[in-house]
A protein has these predicted regions:
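Short loop/turn motifs that connect adjacent beta-strands in outer-membrane beta-barrel proteins
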Residues: 37-40, 53-61, 73-75, 111, ...
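Residues on the lipid-exposed face of transmembrane beta-strands in outer-membrane beta-barrel proteins
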Residues: 54, 66-68, 102-106, 116, ...
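Residues that define the transmembrane beta-barrel architecture of outer-membrane proteins
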Residues: 60, 96-100, 139-145, 162, ...
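Transmembrane beta-barrel strands of outer-membrane/channel proteins
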Residues: 64-70, 116-120, 166-172, 225-229, ...
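Surface-exposed strand-loop-strand hairpins of Gram-negative outer-membrane beta-barrel proteins
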Residues: 70-99, 197
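Outer membrane beta-barrel transmembrane domains
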Residues: 77-87, 235-362
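Surface-exposed loop and membrane-interface regions of Gram-negative outer-membrane beta-barrel proteins
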Residues: 84-95, 108-146, 294
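Outer-membrane pore/translocation modules
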Residues: 122-253
Length: 362
């Protein structure tokens, strides 16, 4: 969550009201926001505007940010319906992921900037193993690094009440997508790849177009819109699923991912740079990718829609944001592989997320 920051303006003449909106726009996210493989969103992908907003970053200035996201999933869904029998029988997958992202942005002009994201993750998954007992598998480390170019559509000086930021990024497969841990069989522990939801990387190069926009509606009130779509051209990454079907090897897909957010932000205390926001958020993985379409690899496609409240505080060179998206709708869609086999798809979803960010400009 980087910043291509925003103008200070408002009736108080102290901190701008818009600064806060920038924080609202990039409140996630994303490092590696994001996403849906078996636990939407499994990978945290930060929007390049960042949860930090501050001002339009001046030429030759920097902004550094640190974001965090907490995810805990224990509920299993098939389609829109929760499947409580898994939890009741002790066979549900429980996933916990702590995601961090360090972001760095450099402004070439007031309209053009570049951002670098270094994501890190620490995840664990607990489920029933073949020995009839529940065990926990763990994976963590550096995720998939992303380099992003950002451009404001209009001159900030001439358009202080609204603007659109267009970004285009490249995701490199720097995260481990073959992480292993011990899986317990009836004859003892064996090393196997961990579930795809806690793999630090997905194993593919990606292209990430983004758009973020804001518009002043009333004094101290702003509407915002933000989203990205990760295009992963690679079809499969060569890593087997955690529990391959006997006699049939199933390889993990490298799926596309997407996120969208929209809502309102209101500066409740302009003199102290304090604002509240409320909006909606959707995270997901499509059944079929833009490039390559649908494949017979292992993917857990679906989406989650959240009510997305937030708090933003901007003081001096620092901006802090906190968001707590609460799930309203969860849908585990049937994958191409499961459709061919004539079976239902199942996947875990979080009830809520906790997302925090702090940034400083130089």
């Amino acid at each position: 969550m980087i910043t291509a920051t925003w103008p200070f303006f408002g009736t108080t003449g102290t901190r701008p009201t818009v600064v806060i909106l920038a924080a609202t726009l990039g409140i996630f996210a994303p490092g590696q926001d994001g996403f849906a493989q078996g636990c939407i969103p499994a990978r945290h992908i930060a929007l390049s505007l960042g949860a930090e907003g501050i001002t339009y970053l001046e030429p030759n200035h920097w902004d550094i940010s640190l974001s965090y996201r907490y995810l805990h999933s224990a509920d299993i869904f098939s389609g829109y319906d929760e499947q409580p029998q898994f939890k009741a029988g002790g066979s549900n997958n429980v996933t916990t992921i702590h995601s961090f992202a360090v972001g760095l942005t450099y402004a070439f002009t007031t309209r053009l900037s570049a951002s670098l994201f270094l994501p890190f993750t620490d995840g664990e998954g607990t489920n029933m193993h073949d020995d009839g007992k529940r065990h926990t598998m763990h994976a963590g480390g550096l995720g998939d690094i992303r380099l992003v170019g950002n451009a404001w559509l209009w001159d900030p000086a001439r358009n202080p009440k609204g603007n659109i930021l267009l970004s285009l990024g490249v995701k490199a497969p720097t995260g481990d997508y073959r992480a292993t841990d011990y899986f317990y069989t009836r004859t003892g522990p064996v090393l196997r790849p961990v579930h795809v939801s806690i793999q630090p990387g997905d194993g593919g190069w990606g292209i990430v177009p983004e758009v973020q926009a804001y518009r002043q509606i009333l004094q101290n009130a702003y509407g915002y819109l933000a989203g990205f779509y990760l295009i992963n051209p690679r079809v499969k990454n060569g890593t087997e699923t955690l529990r391959p079907t006997p006699g049939h090897v199933v390889i993990n897909s490298v799926p596309d991912q997407y996120q969208g957010r929209a809502g309102l932000s209101y500066v409740v205390w302009p003199e102290q740079g304090v604002a509240l926001s409320l909006g909606a958020r959707i995270d997901g993985i499509p059944v079929r990718d833009l490039i390559g379409g649908g494949d017979d690899g292992f993917r857990q496609a679906g989406f989650a829609i959240y009510l997305d409240p937030g708090l933003i505080i901007s003081r001096g060179r620092y901006t802090f944001s906190l968001s707590g998206p609460v799930a309203l709708v969860r849908n585990e869609e049937q994958s191409v592989r499961d459709a061919k086999a004539g079976v239902r798809s199942f996947g875990g979803f979080a009830d809520f997320l906790i997302v925090a960010s702090i940034s400083r400009r130089f």
